[in-house]
Each structure stands twice: as structure tokens, then as C-alpha cells.
Swiss-Prot record:
<keyword id="KW-0472">Membrane</keyword>
<dbReference type="Pfam" id="PF01070">
    <property type="entry name" value="FMN_dh"/>
</dbReference>
<keyword id="KW-0560">Oxidoreductase</keyword>
<dbReference type="InterPro" id="IPR037396">
    <property type="entry name" value="FMN_HAD"/>
</dbReference>
<feature type="binding site">
    <location>
        <position position="106"/>
    </location>
    <ligand>
        <name>FMN</name>
    </ligand>
</feature>
<keyword id="KW-0997">Cell inner membrane</keyword>
<feature type="active site" description="Proton acceptor">
    <location>
        <position position="275"/>
    </location>
</feature>
<keyword id="KW-0288">FMN</keyword>
<keyword id="KW-0285">Flavoprotein</keyword>
<dbReference type="GO" id="GO:0005886">
    <property type="term" value="C:plasma membrane"/>
</dbReference>
<dbReference type="GO" id="GO:0009060">
    <property type="term" value="P:aerobic respiration"/>
</dbReference>
<dbReference type="InterPro" id="IPR012133">
    <property type="entry name" value="Alpha-hydoxy_acid_DH_FMN"/>
</dbReference>
<feature type="binding site">
    <location>
        <position position="278"/>
    </location>
    <ligand>
        <name>substrate</name>
    </ligand>
</feature>
<dbReference type="GO" id="GO:0004459">
    <property type="term" value="F:L-lactate dehydrogenase activity"/>
</dbReference>
<dbReference type="GO" id="GO:0010181">
    <property type="term" value="F:FMN binding"/>
</dbReference>
<feature type="binding site">
    <location>
        <position position="251"/>
    </location>
    <ligand>
        <name>FMN</name>
    </ligand>
</feature>
<dbReference type="InterPro" id="IPR020920">
    <property type="entry name" value="LldD"/>
</dbReference>
Length: 380
């Protein structure tokens, strides 16, 4: 299969992965209305083409949370990345660091914190959920700090898990799931060898380290779902803010009031996100929510965005809407599933190339010059 654009990786990943894994990455909540709107709303935003602006010297370099980056992009936390490619979190982290952008390790990664960070010269980012088991949360934070990680993404839009109907149809969940997953692996021999056999152990590394015993996919579905905490409030997070000395980013903000609450809480940044359309179907796309949130917080904290970003053009659109940087989730997951570390590296190169073309044709010579003036109208 020819890979000439970031979107080509989706079809390639669908061919390579067993259905239960592809649809786990690809799917959303309920009827997947928000999943579709995330992509569609971004694609409908018109950039303002401006010519004769002397764009011979373009720079995508930026700084986020004290880190100098080659472009305002980070890899988002994606659970079970180590099931998409052999020790997938390590491969993705290496590709990101080679490109000069951050990789974010999910709470529910296959590879534990220590394994991933030991393979990277610079600190990765770490993502944590709000869970009933505060002991696990403290253990994860302590281990992250001990490994040298200083940037925390705290996901707050999962007090309860979303209803992802595709998982039942694909074999990811349901009583017949284990049998169906084995049968699917048998007809995907490349994945079965690379990941199923050579990618062991298939633990949820961060959870099994804490529990002191191996974990499996049933634990991902069972233990994690049982530990989401619907009673959480801003006050419950104060101990984390006092414990974590580095930058703390709140992920899952869709409302300006919540964004202002994050400022009052003392967050260093927020991620405007609807969890990639995987939680509450029917909410605003991130592209529609972003402008009002960016206006509400101004320079009081750093605004990032995710959900629906598939291309370099999408990155430029999000920056013009008010984000200082973006997180790539599905886009890198598809690339990782297709060609491992090399796939993620190539994806990031494609994203950069598309950003450079978009900036040149809108007259922006630096990231700072990508503003609302780079757009023709705002999404309604």
C-alpha cells in the first residue's frame, strides 16, 4: 500500500490489525456523531490564502511547558498502544523524540513507565486518570517522578466510561470476546507473530507493577472500569497539584467555565478535547469549542487541543482557532500499527510538510503568525 498522506495510514492499519484492535482505536461512543463531527468541522474551516509574503524562511519551532519543540505537536496518550505494534509505546516514544516532539504515555499502556522512559534520552509526558484507587494514582505519580518525568496530563472527562458499541461488535468486549480475539489473530499472522508472540508480555504494565501480578485485557475492561470515580471534584485534585511539582495539564475541557476553573485550580495547561468522540456523543467538536475557551482563558494558561486532527492542515487550523499546540491520537496509532517506529516517524514528517505548505500559502513565517486572521470566518 502506498503511503503518501497521513490519512493513508488508516486503511493500512485496518488491513494489518485484528478487527477488535482496529475498531478499538477507530471507534467512538454511541452513534459516533461526535467522532465524525470532530473531523468534518475541522475540514470545513477555511484558511485565508495570502501571497507575496516572503516565506523563504519558515520556522515551526515552538516552546511548550519549558520544552523547545520542532513543531507544536505531541503524541496523545492512547491506551493499549503496545498491542498495535511490538512494545508499541517504546517505538512511538522513540519516533517522537527523534522528531523533537513529546510522547505521552497512557495510564493503561502495555509498556510500564520505567521501560519507556529508559529508552528515551529526554523526559516523556505521562497521563493519569482520576481513579477510586488513590493508592494506584500516588504510586503512578511517584514512579513517573522517579523516572524523570516532569509533565503530567490529567484526564478528567472519564468519571464513567463511555458506551462504545463497536467494541461489542468487534470482539473487544462481550462474553464471546476472548474466543473471537483468538480467531481474529489467527487470520492476521503478521500481527500474531510481531505482537502476539514477540511482543510479550501483554500486561497493562503500570497496573501490574502496582498490583504485583500480571494483568490482561480483561483487567483493562474490568479493573479500570470499576475504578473510574464519578464523585470527583476540583477539590479532590488538590493533593495532586500539591504533590506534582512539574507542569500539570488538564485534559477533557469543552466548556469555558471549566477552563476558567482550571485556571483557578492552578493548572499550567488544558487540552480542549472530547476524548476523540469516545465519551459523550453529541457534544461539541473540539474545533467548535476551542475559540470560546481560548478567549476565556487568554494567557492565563496554555491551551492545547485534540480530537479530529488527522493532517498538518488540521494542526494549522487548530492553531488558528486558538491552540498553542495539538495532540495527535488516532493519527499516530494508525501509523504505528502499520510500520511501527518508522511509521510514526514518517507520519510526523508528513505532518510537518503539510504544515509548511499551509503556512507558506497563508503567509505565516512562524507559529506565532498563525492567528484568527489566518482564517476566513469562524466555525458556527
Amino acid at each position: 500500500m502506498i503511503i503518501s498522506s497521513p490519512n493513508d495510514y488508516r486503511a493500512a492499519a485496518k488491513s494489518r490489525l485484528p478487527p477488535f484492535l482496529f475498531h478499538y482505536v477507530d471507534g467512538g461512543a454511541y452513534a459516533e456523531y461526535t467522532l465524525r463531527r470532530n473531523v468534518e468541522d475541522l475540514s470545513h474551516i477555511a484558511l485565508r490564502q495570502q501571497v507575496l509574503r516572503n516565506v523563504a524562511d519558515l520556522s515551526l519551532e515552538t516552546e511548550l511547558f519549558g520544552q523547545k519543540l520542532t513543531m507544536p505537536v505531541a503524541l496523545a496518550p492512547v491506551g493499549l498502544t503496545g498491542m498495535l505494534a511490538r512494545r508499541g509505546e517504546v517505538q512511538a516514544a522513540k519516533a517522537a523524540q527523534a522528531k523533537g516532539v513529546p510522547f505521552t504515555l497512557s495510564t493503561v499502556s502495555v509498556c510500564p513507565i520505567e521501560e519507556v522512559q529508559s529508552q528515551c534520552a529526554k523526559p516523556i509526558w505521562f497521563q493519569l486518570y482520576v481513579l477510586k484507587d488513590r493508592g494506584f494514582m500516588r504510586n503512578a505519580l511517584e514512579r513517573a517522578q522517579a523516572a524523570g518525568i516532569n509533565t503530567l496530563i490529567f484526564t478528567v472527562d472519564m468519571p464513567v466510561p463511555g458506551a462504545r458499541y463497536r467494541d461489542a461488535h468487534s470482539g473487544m468486549s462481550g462474553r464471546s470476546g476472548p474466543t473471537r480475539r483468538v480467531l481474529q489473530a489467527m487470520v492476521h499472522p503478521r500481527w500474531a507473530l510481531d505482537v502476539g508472540l514477540l511482543g510479550k508480555p501483554h500486561d497493562l504494565g503500570n497496573i501490574s507493577t502496582y498490583r504485583g501480578k500480571p494483568t490482561n485485557l480483561a483487567d483493562y475492561i474490568g479493573w479500570l472500569a470499576a475504578n473510574f470515580d464519578p464523585s470527583i471534584s476540583w477539590k479532590d485534585l488538590e493533593w495532586i497539584r500539591s504533590f506534582w511539582k512539574g507542569p500539570m495539564i488538564i485534559k477533557g475541557i469543552l466548556d469555558p467555565v471549566d477552563a476558567r476553573d482550571a485556571v483557578a485550580f492552578g493548572a499550567d495547561g488544558i487540552v480542549v478535547s472530547n476524548h476523540g468522540g469516545r465519551q459523550l456523543d453529541g457534544v461539541l467538536s473540539s474545533a467548535r469549542a476551542l475559540p470560546a475557551i481560548a478567549d476565556a482563558v487568554g494567557d492565563d494558561l496554555t491551551v492545547l487541543a485534540d480530537s479530529g486532527i488527522r493532517t498538518g492542515l488540521d494542526v494549522v487550523r487548530m492553531l488558528a482557532l486558538g491552540a498553542k499546540g495539538v495532540l495527535l491520537g488516532r493519527a499516530f496509532a494508525y501509523a504505528l500499527a502499520t510500520h511501527g517506529q518508522a511509521g510514526v516517524a514518517n507520519l510526523l514528517d508528513l505532518i510537518e510538510k503539510e504544515m509548511r505548505v499551509a503556512m507558506a500559502l497563508t503567509g505565516a513565517r512562524s507559529i506565532a503568525e498563525i492567528t484568527r486572521d489566518s482564517l476566513v470566518g469562524l466555525p458556527r
